[in-house]
């Protein structure tokens, strides 16, 4: 074989090799999708079964009801767990709290937190360094309604492999389906992420939550999410917070929580002013503006900002045991601080209010 023929054979051989570059290697690494850690996280079925068993073990403190709704052939169920000692739910002197978790299917860690809070309320688990006498005094004053998994149909889509799904079982974002500023679209609107539905409250899940909020008339509402670390108050559809005494009390509470439990790591302020985009048709804005709940919040309990955009399980949920435990412990403690000081804030004497402000001066917003 002459040298010219050998040269062309070598060129053809090189052309047949797979093309490789450092850019491709980086892309391959970024395309890795983290699966659900089944050793850490309950399935939706197992989590609800564990909650039901917890309720049955403590009938003097807990009860559970399942509320159903349907719209145009689409059905949804929402389980609501109520904590109230001696089951005196009609006691108007008690501080009423409504907490909802799992509104977005991909945020599994939020429902794990719901289970942890219920376990502490039932006194099967305890927070580190918790004073049990102080806990008893606090719990005597409360009625807490917990929705552990608001969007169970969307959660099942995540468990079936669509790890980035945040919408409900027919593709609507439940946190864009409420009526305050509903349907408005920003320039960066993503229909996959933010589909608001055909009309306000078109979705059974939103209908159930609205009915629950209006009938229960809570003093305090928290919508629990993940994706970042934040303690947000209204508004989501504006880049400002409300005026007045109620707003001042909400600011005092989030500053206290941020200082006490998170060393100032959490973003605070309005959702619309802190996140970098406005959100329209959200639950918390309706709860504050229309339902007139005096203290309404959206908490974001975890986020991995280094995760690639398609690696949603890692982005929204802790993937290792140490971080998982830390998130549940820190946020459980934060909620029990709310349970303790929330009633004081709403019925606060001036001397107590100044003491709270002295204990926790305003912290700078963490951006």
Language-model features: where?
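Bacterial N-terminal signal peptides that target proteins for export
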Residues: 1-9
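N-terminal signal peptide
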Residues: 2, 13-35
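Soluble metallo-hydrolase cores and metallopeptidase-like ectodomains found primarily
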Residues: 43-95
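Solvent-exposed, polar/charged alpha-helical surfaces in well-ordered, non-transmembrane soluble domains
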Residues: 45, 49-52, 115, 119, ...
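Structured segments of extracytoplasmic/periplasmic soluble domains
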Residues: 50-57, 117-124, 149, 212-216, ...
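Active-site/substrate-binding loop(s) of hydrolase catalytic cores
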Residues: 93-103, 107-248, 300, 307-316
């Amino acid at each position: 074989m002459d040298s010219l023929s050998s040269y062309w054979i070598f060129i053809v051989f090189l052309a047949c090799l797979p093309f490789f570059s450092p850019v491709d290697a980086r892309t391959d690494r970024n395309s890795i999708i983290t699966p659900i850690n089944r050793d850490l996280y309950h399935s939706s079925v197992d989590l609800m079964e564990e909650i039901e068993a917890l309720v049955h073990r403590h009938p003097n403190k807990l009860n559970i009801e399942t509320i159903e709704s349907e719209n145009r052939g689409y059905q949804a169920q929402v389980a609501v767990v109520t904590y109230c000692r001696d089951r005196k739910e009609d006691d108007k002197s008690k501080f009423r709290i409504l907490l909802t978790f799992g509104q977005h299917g991909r945020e599994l860690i939020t429902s794990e937190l719901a289970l942890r809070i219920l376990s502490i309320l039932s006194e099967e688990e305890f927070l580190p360094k918790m004073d049990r006498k102080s806990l008893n005094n606090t719990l005597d004053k409360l009625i807490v309604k917990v929705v552990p998994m608001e969007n169970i149909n969307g959660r099942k889509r995540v468990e079936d492999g669509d790890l980035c799904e945040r919408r409900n079982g027919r593709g609507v974002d439940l946190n864009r389906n409420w009526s305050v500023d509903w349907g408005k679209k920003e320039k960066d609107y993503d229909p996959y992420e933010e589909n608001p539905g055909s009309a306000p409250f078109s979705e059974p899940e939103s209908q159930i939550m609205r009915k629950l909020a209006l009938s229960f008339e809570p003093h305090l509402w928290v919508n629990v999410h993940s994706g970042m670390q934040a303690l947000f108050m209204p508004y989501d559809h504006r880049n400002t917070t409300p005026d007045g005494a109620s707003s001042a009390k909400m600011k005092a509470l989030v500053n206290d929580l941020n200082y006490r439990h998170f060393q100032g790591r959490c973003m605070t302020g309005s959702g619309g002013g802190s996140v970098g985009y406005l959100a329209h048709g959200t639950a918390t804005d309706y709860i504050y503006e229309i339902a007139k709940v005096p203290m309404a919040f959206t908490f974001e309990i975890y986020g991995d900002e280094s995760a690639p955009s398609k690696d949603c399980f890692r982005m929204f949920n802790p993937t290792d045991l140490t971080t998982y435990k830390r998130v549940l412990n820190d946020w459980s403690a934060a909620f029990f601080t709310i349970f303790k000081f929330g009633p004081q804030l709403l019925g606060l004497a001036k001397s107590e209010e100044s003491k709270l402000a002295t204990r926790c001066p305003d912290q700078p917003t963490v951006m």
